[in-house]
Swiss-Prot record:
Similarity section: Belongs to the formate--tetrahydrofolate ligase family.
A Pfam family per the record: FTHFS
UniProt catalytic activity: (6S)-5,6,7,8-tetrahydrofolate + formate + ATP = (6R)-10-formyltetrahydrofolate + ADP + phosphate
Organism: Desulforapulum autotrophicum (strain ATCC 43914 / DSM 3382 / VKM B-1955 / HRM2) (Desulfobacterium autotrophicum)
Protein name as it appears in the record: Formate--tetrahydrofolate ligase
Amino acid sequence: MALDPTKHADWEIAQDAEKDMLTIYEIGEKLGLTKEELLPQGHYIAKIDFRAVLARLKDKPDGKYIDVTAITPTPLGEGKSTSSMGLVQGLGKLGKSVCAAIRQPSGGPTMNIKGSAAGGGLAQCIPLTPFSLGFTGDINAIMNAHNLAMVALTSRMQHERNYTDEQLERLSGMKRIDIDPTRVEMGWIMDFCCQSLRNIIIGIDGVNGKSDGYMMKSKFGIAVSSEVMAILAVAKDLKDMRERMGKIVVAYTKKGKPVTTEDLQVAGAMTAWMVDALNPSLIQTLEGQPVLVHAGPFANIAIGQSSIIADRVGLKLADYHVTESGFGADIGFEKFWNLKCRFSGLKPDCAVIVATIRALKCHGGAPVPVPGKPMPEEYNTESVEWVEKGCANLLHHIRNVRKAGISPVVCINAFYSDTDAEIAKVRELSEAEGARVALSRHWEKGGDGAIEFAETVIEACEEETEFKFLYELDMPLKERIELIAKEVYGADGVDYSNEANASLARIQADPELAKLGMCMVKTHLSLSDNPSLKGVPTGWRLMIREVLTYGGAGFIVPVAGTISLMPGTGSNPAFKRVDVDCETGKVEGVF
């Protein structure tokens, strides 16, 4: 019998369930994989040979495609991964053939505030510790591939400074690129949250001692913000990945010409690091349903999706395939809608919007909960008024999903402190907006608590959809940014820094770059670019401070507000509570 989530930590529940979990071959058989298509990494984890699977099942119709998104979250998160696992377990209880695709957790949040992305309570994926701490090495491969590009760039700059054109040609066959050190687009990456590395100087002794590099400003981002990670999420196959890898813009020349990884002759070696990472990984839920894990970009600072490859595999193997978009529907679902589905050609049958009474109270005026601190008393006291006010945020997201032509299902992710009156108000307002609504207690009861949720999703999947994109790629860049800002976020308009205006003018003038997709970078804690503005802010304008070019991933990246591609570690990080049992080797405290 499963442990009680009101009395036991997530890691305790996971370790207890892991005593009886299915072997990877049993999970593979459940999903319909052959032994040859499984590439085991121990007894309970495997990579999947996606090429073999897709070739074998090329004529099989796809299953139903379900995206799980959420309302604008509090800093604590609203249980989107938990709800994804709960939905899969609920569908399993109904005897449905089901699969999930989720993102690999980053070491940064796992060791910081948010924790892992395995779900929680009785709706988790296992084995928890390897899933949370490095897993099958994909993020490590991404770091190596990305940082190799920076090695190629910085060493090239050093050699061009140290040698004449004739010496470069004689020593290595190089021709001078003449990179502008003030226009290096790329930085270094690591898989932790470290504010000290946001702005750095490298090559400090490289001015007089010419063997120590090229002294210049540089930066670190978190690994999941890397364009290499984005490429893993959107690549269709190895050939597509190799082509995309060569289009990464690392810098510009002094004449303003983009310098790519292909120009630096490093794209092939970068791809070599990524060959194994292109295969999705396979694990299971607490109740033995298959879960694919592939790619891990955040939605606030990146594309925020698990991979297209994982979705294609899941749709061929299962009748119901559940994927997940990061954070709220304004950023994660918007990118699923206008980027991932555009790249993949896949059309969703249903979108789930996860809502909690806690988040609705926060959007309705209750104090914002702070990770690591006691929950304000307002969240343990009934307040239908706060919930009703906060529902404005939920209704905004319902309308956005409807703009995509998809059937929305509101999942009320129940907490034991929620009251019947609060839940009834959410149901009333959501149904009045035309959404289906399900109350789910998967955190507390696992699949048994998600039956209504699963049945509602099945019903929604039978409804005809009229899926359509928000914008076409031939629309001018500024018009697209303003359309997203007004239609999805609710802004009055958009303002641009001088730097952003210059970048957009340069990109718009390039016929190839001007038709790339649009991947907005914005806080996840508000519909606006100001994380302190809750509910549905009015009378505000989106501020674009810079615009990046991700030519390999296939999109332009407008960066809004003050958000950073390298998060910081808080004052009460999760790593303080992680340790090992030296007798058993078991890791404790991961959540």
